[in-house]
A protein has these predicted regions:
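Carbohydrate-active catalytic/glycan-binding domains of CAZyme proteins
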Residues: 1-197
């Protein structure tokens, strides 16, 4: 069983049936499982042979993680590796206002990253992974945060916090359910790099 729980059955144009199921695997997310489906007395029966005879995809699949320099040509459409944490508010982000940059502006101030709009995300890859981001924080406003986070239900982040006209680099731990600033340092430059491993 291994915790395989949610999913469904699908049919191909050729009339073959498969089960596509998922198993929760902590920070990796949900791992997909493909099983063969046969029908017994009009009831689907899933079997898991060691191999399935499925032809290779000839269309091509976009990767689920990618590096991005945000140099897109019109019409601008984010790479499919990117996901929004909520439905995006399109008037508050742009890749054309400053070519080569993803620009996000604040529509409101939130107290929790899980509530913040226009949070751009990518899936983690495997049980360990790294993420690096370069930020231009020159135009931040009072109450703004910008940074890099790894989150599911519990989370933490490193970022820049703006209070009044003062910028600070902060490290926040929210694994207890509320944001706790565990480290802070003054910031006197407009470009910062963050990395999470």
């Amino acid at each position: 069983n291994n915790g395989v729980a949610q999913g469904g059955i699908i049919s191909t144009p050729e009339g073959k049936w498969y089960g596509l199921l998922f198993r929760d695997n902590g920070s990796v997310g949900r791992i997909p499982y493909l099983t063969q489906v046969t029908w017994t007395n009009n009831w689907p029966m899933m079997t898991a042979p060691a191999t399935l005879d499925i032809p290779a995809n000839t269309i091509g699949i976009s990767g689920i993680v990618t590096s991005d320099d945000f140099n897109y040509s019109a019409p601008v459409k984010l790479h499919t590796a990117w996901q929004w944490n909520h439905n995006p508010q399109n008037s508050y982000w742009s890749m054309t206002a400053r070519p080569g940059y993803f620009r996000s502006t604040t529509s409101r101030v939130d107290t929790d990253i899980k509530l913040a709009r226009n949070t751009l995300t990518q899936r983690t890859y495997g049980s360990t992974c790294s993420g690096v981001v370069s930020l231009d924080v020159a135009n931040m406003k009072d109450g703004d945060y910008a940074g890099l986070s790894m989150f599911q239900d519990k989370y933490g982040f490193v970022g820049v916090k703006m209070v009044g006209t003062t910028k600070s680099i902060v490290m926040v731990n929210a694994s207890s359910g509320s944001m706790v600033e565990v480290a802070s340092a003054p910031l006197n430059q407009n470009t910062v790099y963050f990395r999470i491993d």
